[in-house]
């Protein structure tokens, strides 16, 4: 087995010693904070749980009083000027939960002030009015309901709204996504039999507040553990509110939370208590993976926290959760990793038996969707096993799951347990660096083929590059302390990987600037990144991340050797040659050298994937065309523009568009070199195109049956049947693409129309070229059937692949971003996106022609400059330079209209979405602009050099 990835030595011994002392202090303080009965918890106070605890009444000696008046006063202190209880930029749902629960608590106190007499009814009325107004405002613009991963939100918010409607004596709250919420509620409830809650433990016990009046709480007392319902103060509060028999143990638990939680008696209640196992494992693993050695931080604190984990795994039969009796794969895997790092390994076999699913590990029993970070924690724990080969199937499964997740993630990768994309990104870099290290050493080389290794390398490279590209000028990532730590830890890990050799100075500069910002950052600035019912910070864990980031960043830079077995990371000579052209374009000439090189390296990971599909549709070896050198540059055109604009479209979208670009070139060549000559009679070829498209649309099963490799035709002269078979494969690959079939019917119809037009335009172009080639002179097209304007807006423009590719992209957005809804729903949006497509297509044709004049003249192909409008002006013949100048002016005109159409589309999309304009509305526009950037890049490259293969 290869040696472990070694950290360097501290650059500054004094600084290193300071960090070691601080780490040992953290471990000691965390261990001493552990209560033998109630456990350990440093999670921040949450309004939501505070509100529920504020609603607990208790009757003593026939006198009813509020049990925790401090919580009520905490709510008064934390209400914002706008009536809400705060908001987070990363989640609307948390703000709605906080505001709704706090308003409900105020309503309860307004109706029964009981012993609290220092707040006037007028003030209470005003606070409630402002709170309700804020809640309605938040509900009106709520657009992340389907994306939210807050625990139990499908149960809790409907219950809260129902309670508020009853207390306020108002009809139902109406808001745009109410039907979506109700559907989610019904689907989630369908997974549970409420009667079973009285027997075995269930995740519903964590959210009992959603079931007040629906369950007999007196039958739930046996589920209490050390006074809590699944370590949830809000659920425990609901139990005390709903049960007819008072439970002193539950009251004692809440009093302990009040006194010893992050609020320290000020009325604030932690959202989860305790978080013993979570904090023990995260603190240990974070420090030891973050540059501290076991020898440096060994002591009572480290040994004490390790013992807590060992005893928990023993007492709970090999699987644990964030607290006792809350088993999940996340905390189990992290505990196994932590114990491996302190040389006290525990077998992962029980974890695998309990949580392994068909294609991923589940976090716990019933969950709406899987967790990326849970699977990464499993992978990291398995990679530390001494008998690695025993766990090859699980390592393969979690690696494949992670690759697929990253491949399909648009913009930022998301996870259900942390609001920051940087957390799963950090874990991915950490895990995949270790995977590559083991591949290099031979331990995992048999598990992964070249394509898989390509995707592992690509995932690491993109993760690190995007962290670098999104660092703020002050050295932080959006001014958040813990998220900046995640970024630094990922970058430090990347210093071991050879892919980053060409940009190591930039990488180190990012680490240094992050280090400086972090050292000056106050410990009092909260970063609420962890999710439960709302969002919270874990004090000790945040401190561990800060120390790990500072320590790892201060170590000497090691030699970057990991990843040498992934040969795709080395750009081809063809790609490097084309980069000299790219540097001359207006889009990329302002870019720093390192940034351009980074996109070149990222592109190189896609090239082998594209090469593997090179002859899937079209045979090439027996076709009289030059070598397809464009294959090397296609990935860069998409990757470079993606990074330049910081769009970060999914690899799924990027690769599909790359492949479509490849097919566009190949179709052009095939129609000219094979289909046209084989058919001879172009009218028959027109009929064949219609038949192929109609059959593909009408008989998916038949179309699927024709999909096979083009290799079968490459050593024989093609006949009409073989051409039809090839065109059927191509048509099927576009119109019956999985995501196209999952897109809206309107977007599919548009693609079908544009594709049919594209195919027929090729045949018409063949006819035009045939007539042109028979002319005595190749200087001017003497028999055009249309004016230049008509031609470029029909045959000429449609002949390039731009329009149908645009429609294809819209189908991908419909399927993957918009759950099968129209990419552009209103009539105005549809018109404007069509205008964008038309102007982009016309530009593409014009610039393509500008760059291919010499080739078209040699091959006698019709070019824009051959039309009479260019050859003559006021009866005077125009020379080549004059024609090119006029063509560029018209192309510039089209560019202006394209820009205006894009602006109008953006305005209209915002107007149609109104206040509920969310991330998906903005994402589709970003992707449209990215597509236009790629088109623009091709246009600029065509001006510099013709990219198409020449006919032999």
Curated annotation (Swiss-Prot):
One of its GO terms (biological process) is gibberellin biosynthetic process. Keywords: Isomerase, Lyase, Magnesium, Metal-binding. Mg(2+) 3 binds at residues 848-849, 852, 856. Disruption phenotype: Impairs the production of gibberellins. Mg(2+) 2 binds at residues 668, 672. Its EC number is 4.2.3.19, 5.5.1.13. The keyword Zinc does not apply. It catalyses: ent-copalyl diphosphate = ent-kaur-16-ene + diphosphate; (2E,6E,10E)-geranylgeranyl diphosphate = ent-copalyl diphosphate. A motif (DXDD B-type cyclization motif) lies at residues 328-331. Its cofactor is Mg(2+). Induction: Expression is induced under gibberellin-producing conditions. Pathway: Plant hormone biosynthesis; gibberellin biosynthesis. One of its GO terms (molecular function) is ent-kaurene synthase activity. Mg(2+) 1 binds at residues 668, 672. A motif (DEXXE A-type cyclization motif) lies at residues 668-672. It comes from the Eukaryota. Belongs to the terpene synthase family. Bifunctional ent-kaurene synthase; part of the gene cluster that mediates the biosynthesis of gibberellins (GAs), diterpenoids that may provide a selective advantage during infection of the preferred host plant, rice. Gibberellins (GAs) are diterpenoids and are synthesized via the mevalonate pathway. Biosynthesis of the major metabolite GA3 (gibberellic acid) from geranylgeranyl diphosphate (GGPP) requires 13 steps. The Asp-Asp-Xaa-Xaa-Asp/Glu (DDXXD/E) motif is important for the catalytic activity, presumably through binding to Mg(2+). This is Bifunctional ent-kaurene synthase. It comes from Gibberella fujikuroi (strain CBS 195.34 / IMI 58289 / NRRL A-6831) (Bakanae and foot rot disease fungus). The gene is CPS/KS.
């Amino acid at each position: 087995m290869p040696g472990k990835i070694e950290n360097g030595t501290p650059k500054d011994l004094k600084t290193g010693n300071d960090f070691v002392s601080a780490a040992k202090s953290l471990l000691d303080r965390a261990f001493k904070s552990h209560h033998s009965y109630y456990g350990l918890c440093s999670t921040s106070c949450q309004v939501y749980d505070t509100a529920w605890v504020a609603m607990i009444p208790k009757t003593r000696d026939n006198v009813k009083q509020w049990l925790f008046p401090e919580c009520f006063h905490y709510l008064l202190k934390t209400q914002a000027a706008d009536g809400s209880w705060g908001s987070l930029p990363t989640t609307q749902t948390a703000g709605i939960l906080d505001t709704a629960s706090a308003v409900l608590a105020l309503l309860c106190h307004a109706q029964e002030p009981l012993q609290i007499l220092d707040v006037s009814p007028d003030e209470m009325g005003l606070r409630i009015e402002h709170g309700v107004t804020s809640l309605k405002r938040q509900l009106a613009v709520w657009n992340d309901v389907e994306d939210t991963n807050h625990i139990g939100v499908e149960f809790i918010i409907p219950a809260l709204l129902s309670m508020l409607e009853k207390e306020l004596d108002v009809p139902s709250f109406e808001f745009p996504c109410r039907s979506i919420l109700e559907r989610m509620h019904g689907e989630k409830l369908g997974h549970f039999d409420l009667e079973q809650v009285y027997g075995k433990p269930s995740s519903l016990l964590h959210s009992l507040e959603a079931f007040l009046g629906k369950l007999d709480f007196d039958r739930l007392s046996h589920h209490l553990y050390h006074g809590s319902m699944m370590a949830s103060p809000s659920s425990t509060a609901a139990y005390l509110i709903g049960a007819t028999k008072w439970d002193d143990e539950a009251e004692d638990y809440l009093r302990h939370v009040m006194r010893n939680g992050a609020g320290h008696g000020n009325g604030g209640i932690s959202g989860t208590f305790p978080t013993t196992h979570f904090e023990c494992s995260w603190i240990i693993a974070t420090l030891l993976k973050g540059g501290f050695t076991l020898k440096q931080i060994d002591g009572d604190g480290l040994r004490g926290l390790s013992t807590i984990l060992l005893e928990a795994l023993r007492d709970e039969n090999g699987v644990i959760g964030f607290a006792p009796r809350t088993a999940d794969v996340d905390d189990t895997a992290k505990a196994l990793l932590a114990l491996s790092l302190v040389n006290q390994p525990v077998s992962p076999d029980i974890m695998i038996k309990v949580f392994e699913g068909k294609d991923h590990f589940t976090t716990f029993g019933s969950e709406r969707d899987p967790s990326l970070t849970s699977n990464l924690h499993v992978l990291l724990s398995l990679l530390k096993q001494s008998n690695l080969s025993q766990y090859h199937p699980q390592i393969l499964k979690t690696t494949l799951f992670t690759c697929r997740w990253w491949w399909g993630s648009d913009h930022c990768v998301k996870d259900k347990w942390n609001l920051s994309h940087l957390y799963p990104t950090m874990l991915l870099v950490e895990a995949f660096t270790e995977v590559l290290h083991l591949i290099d050493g031979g331990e995992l080389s048999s598990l992964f083929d070249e394509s898989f290794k390509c995707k592992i390398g690509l995932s690491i490279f993109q993760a690190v590059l995007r962290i670098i590209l999104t660092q703020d000028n002050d050295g932080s990532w959006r001014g958040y302390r813990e998220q900046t730590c995640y970024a630094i830890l990922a970058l430090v890990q990347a210093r071991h990987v050879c892919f980053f050799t060409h940009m190591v100075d930039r990488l180190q500069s990012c680490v240094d600037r992050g280090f400086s910002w972090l050292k000056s950052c106050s410990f009092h600035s909260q970063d609420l990144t962890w999710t439960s019912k709302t969002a919270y910070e874990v004090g000790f864990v945040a401190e561990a991340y800060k120390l790990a980031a500072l320590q790892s960043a201060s170590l000497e830079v090691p030699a970057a050797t990991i990843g040498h077995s992934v040969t795709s990371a080395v750009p081809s000579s063809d790609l490097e040659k084309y980069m000299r052209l790219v540097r001359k374009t207006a889009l990329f000439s302002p870019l720093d050298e390192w940034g351009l090189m980074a996109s070149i390296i990222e592109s190189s990971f896609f090239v082998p994937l594209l090469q593997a599909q090179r002859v899937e549709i079209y045979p090439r070896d027996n076709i009289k065309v030059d070598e397809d050198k464009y294959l090397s540059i296609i990935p860069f055109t998409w990757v470079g523009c993606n990074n330049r604009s910081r769009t970060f479209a999914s690899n799924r979208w990027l690769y599909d568009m790359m492949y479509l670009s490849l097919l566009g070139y190949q179709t052009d060549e095939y129609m000219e070199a094979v289909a046209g000559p084989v058919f001879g009679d172009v009218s028959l070829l027109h009929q064949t195109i219609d038949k192929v498209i109609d059959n593909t649309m009408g008989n998916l099963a038949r179309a699927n049956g024709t999909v096979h490799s083009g290799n079968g035709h490459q050593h024989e002269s093609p006949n009409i049947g073989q051409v039809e078979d090839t065109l059927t494969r191509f048509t099927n690959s576009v119109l019956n693409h999985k995501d196209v079939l999952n897109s809206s019917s309107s977007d599919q119809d548009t693609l079908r129309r544009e594709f049919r037009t594209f195919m027929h335009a090729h045949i018409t172009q063949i006819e035009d070229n045939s007539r042109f080639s028979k002319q005595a002179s190749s200087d001017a097209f003497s028999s055009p059937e249309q004016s230049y304007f008509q031609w470029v807006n029909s045959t000429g423009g449609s002949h390039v692949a731009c329009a149908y590719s645009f429609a294809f992209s819209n189908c991908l957005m419909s399927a993957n971003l918009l759950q099968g809804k129209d990419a552009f729903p209103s009539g105005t949006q549809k018109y404007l996106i069509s205008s964008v497509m038309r102007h982009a297509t016309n530009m593409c044709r014009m610039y393509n022609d500008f760059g291919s004049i010499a080739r078209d003249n040699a091959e006698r192909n019709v070019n824009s400059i051959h039309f009479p409008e260019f050859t003559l002006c006021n009866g005077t013949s125009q020379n080549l330079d004059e024609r090119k100048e006029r063509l560029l002016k018209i192309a510039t005109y089209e560019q202006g209209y394209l820009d205006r159409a894009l602006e109008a589309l953006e305005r209209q999309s915002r107007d149609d979405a109104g206040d509920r304009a969310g991330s998906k509305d903005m994402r589709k526009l970003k992707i449209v602009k990215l597509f236009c950037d790629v088109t623009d890049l091709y246009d600029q490259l065509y001006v510099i050099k013709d990219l198409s293969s020449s006919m032999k």
